[in-house]
């Protein structure tokens, strides 16, 4: 499998310009906050400070997994000198740095030149900056773990791939949005089932400190289910997907589409996994397919939020950098615009921005899905012939090397 190297004339971003943009965003956004900050994050920090680390983790006090709370406890001493909001945002900034480092690692696996400059671009992206500097969220941490898992996929290090998947899920349930990609890879490459156990092992390892402190196992096992139970009856919450559009058109009827949305997402995931068994991609193409998996699931699952496309943002950016084409960067820009538009809709600009975001995401998903959507001449399994690469409507294109036999080749 060939290594993808940026081969266009597009220059890497100037580190000085990236730093300037990031600094301006920090200056503007740092004093601002969202309701989640005062309703959840600050009370959790105060619980850790008032009870002490050991006593705080002896009983449930959050609807987040303990993994994030460990980090919150680690930075809690800073609250003696800084206000609680700044402490939480500093942790989010540290998560953003981890995300940039993970991007650097993924670009290294893809053989990208000037990857340090490209990875630094992450900290200046609006969707990343608003997530950390305004909302104080930890989404960058689970996304960083997912990028590491994709890097391990490119390098065919499957135990590490599954371990990073477990780490990602330990921070946020949204990590499962890219699960169809890893499942497809594991099936296609016939990864031994024993190696799959690295994912739950990593997850359990991160839960162990809380369990030892006295956190009830039953509570840990149901945290994500209880998170889902707190969602309102809306079919989507400012998510840039088709269900937000449905909610705008028919707000009273849209919640009844929950079953249809779930079935559509599961069907799309099954289609994705099946098609991945018969099409082989180069290294950059694999990253593009990981982005497609995140776009499909976040785009079709019900009850998605505006922040849930951050993973797709990062994966499609890595794909664009590795391809090094203007078309690839246009696709990444489309996803970034869609994601950021939905965030601004949540922040008060309302339904028009969410609708714009949904339109961008739908277009990007269709473009990204074209390599898998190109059908064979008939419904029979592919022959041993190697047709030319599947081509998106110019200038959008993935360099698909060839189709595999239906039974797989162990690649």
What is the predicted function of each stretch?
Residues 66, 81-101, 252-263:
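Loop-to-helix entry region of an early transmembrane alpha helix in multi-pass inner-membrane enzymes
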Residues 101-102, 142-158, 315-316:
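Specific aromatic-rich, kink-prone transmembrane helix
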Residues 100, 109, 228-300:
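Aromatic/glycine/proline-enriched transmembrane-helix motif characteristic
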Residues 1-27, 108-119, 282, 288, ...:
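Start-transfer (signal-anchor) and selected internal transmembrane alpha helices
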Residues 3, 177-201, 211-212, 311:
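Perimembrane helix-loop-helix junctions
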Residues 3, 221-240, 273, 290, ...:
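Transmembrane helical bundles and short interhelical boundary loops of multi-pass, membrane-embedded
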Residues 115-136, 140-151, 161, 165-174, ...:
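Membrane-embedded helix bundles of polyisoprenyl
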Residues 31-46, 59-74, 232-242:
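Extracytoplasmic catalytic/substrate-binding loops of multi-pass membrane glycan-assembly enzymes
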